[in-house]
Amino acid sequence: MQPGRWQLHTLSQDGGRQVHAGFDAVLLLIPAAQASALLQASDVAPGLAAGLHAVEAAPCWTLMVAYPHAVQPGLTTLGPQWNAARSTHHRIAWVARESSKPGRAPVERWTAQASPAWSSEHRNDAPARVQAKLLKAFAEVTGLRAAPVHAEVLYWPDAQTTRPLGRSHLWDAAAGIGLAGDWCLGHRVEDAFVAGLELALAVA
């Protein structure tokens, strides 16, 4: 063990333990709620944990569907001719055709994100129930009523920041621990990039 240096303890799925040592700093680039829980479970940098209390985030149920049977001669897509749209449907806020993106396999695939309000209201619902409701809503939004070959849902508890930290990062030089994420400045990928860059510059 090296005095003043960080150690990382890992636990594998088969129960094996490893210790990695000699790190100058720890940077937590995770949701604010998870970072807060980690900091509160230790006595390191209590001031950083206190700064996270103001951050708020909304959940999101996300539906992913695939239609491999669309890949056949004379049929390139199913459903609408647009590739992405915001929605005013009470369940779904955003839909995107993943297979339209550059470099993607030619298998008709869509992602649909439920609205923050609906996701919050149904946060404790069983995934199968959520999937059935979102499939129905997806068909109503897109007009695509063919049964998908694959469908699954994923729940993100901290998907979209509703009240950001208001600064690009948090960094405690004495403890050697820093925090950053999109939740520092907003909820977009650009916010995550800027937060990470600013933290890296502070550490350097």
Predicted regions and their residues:
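Flavin (FAD/FMN) cofactor-binding core of flavoprotein oxidoreductases
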Residues: A132-A175
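Central helical "cap/lid" subdomain
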Residues: G16-G79, L144-A146
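Short glycine-/small-residue-rich Rossmann-like dinucleotide-binding loops
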Residues: S12, P31-A32, P116
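Active-site substrate-recognition segment that forms the wall
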Residues: M64-Q72, T76-R123, R129, K133-T142
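Active-site-proximal substrate-binding core of FAD-dependent oxidoreductases
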Residues: A202-A204
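Short FAD-binding loop at a beta-strand-to-alpha-helix junction that anchors the flavin cofactor
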Residues: T111, S168-A200
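A short, glycine/Asx- and small/polar-enriched loop/turn
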Residues: M1-W6, P106, T161-R163
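Conserved beta-strand-loop-beta-strand element in the redox core of flavoprotein oxidoreductases
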Residues: M1-A21
